Regions:
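Flexible linker/context regions in extracytoplasmic redox proteins
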Residues: 1-173
Length: 173
């Protein structure tokens, strides 16, 4: 590519990561990419934050919201919205909706395919570093222990006990 970046070997990526994102399962790359005329980075059809941190603004996530409901990240109460919640606290909201250092989807999710059914990446990209996420799915929730915070767990009913010295994640008020 003119900017020096290489295009990913999608055949290998998809072969090694059996849980494919919806458009990949439908063999519809054009749901997200316009290979002939997009002015956006990575030939995307709509906006998607290119960095790890970004202030939350729904306009920055137009690509995601063409398929996913915006409440996935904008609703503080996660019941009926997401399985990624601690009791009723929507943990997508906690991570993404921060006014200055919201984590973008890429902080935890692999956009094309992953080994995890929830498209959880194995590593968190942070600058030139990659940290293991150490995600563990559990019957009523899950746990992770990336370098960005202490080990934490969550439960969809009730609340998970504090899993690290920093305590459970809380949204910025």
């Amino acid at each position: 590519m003119p900017n020096g970046r290489r295009v990913a070997n999608m055949a290998a990526l998809l072969r090694e990561n059996p849980n494919h994102h919806g458009p990949i399962r439908q063999a519809d790359c054009s749901a997200c990419h316009n290979p002939h005329a997009s002015p956006l980075p990575n030939l995307l059809t709509e906006t998607y934050p290119p960095l790890f941190y970004a202030p939350f603004n729904a306009d920055n996530y137009k690509l995601c919201f063409t398929c996913h409901r915006s409440e996935l990240v904008s609703a503080k109460d996660g019941r009926g919205v997401t399985g990624f919640r601690n009791g009723d606290l929507n943990l997508h909201y906690v991570h993404v909706s921060q006014p200055s250092k919201g984590r973008t989807c890429r902080a935890c999710h692999a956009v094309h395919a992953s080994k995890s059914p929830a498209h959880i990446s194995e590593v968190v990209p942070y600058g030139n570093w990659k940290y293991q996420i150490k995600f563990e799915a559990k019957e009523n929730g899950g746990a992770c222990a990336p370098a960005c915070h202490a080990a934490r767990s969550y439960e969809r009913t009730g609340e998970a006990p504090t899993a690290g010295p920093a305590g459970p994640a809380q949204p910025a008020e």
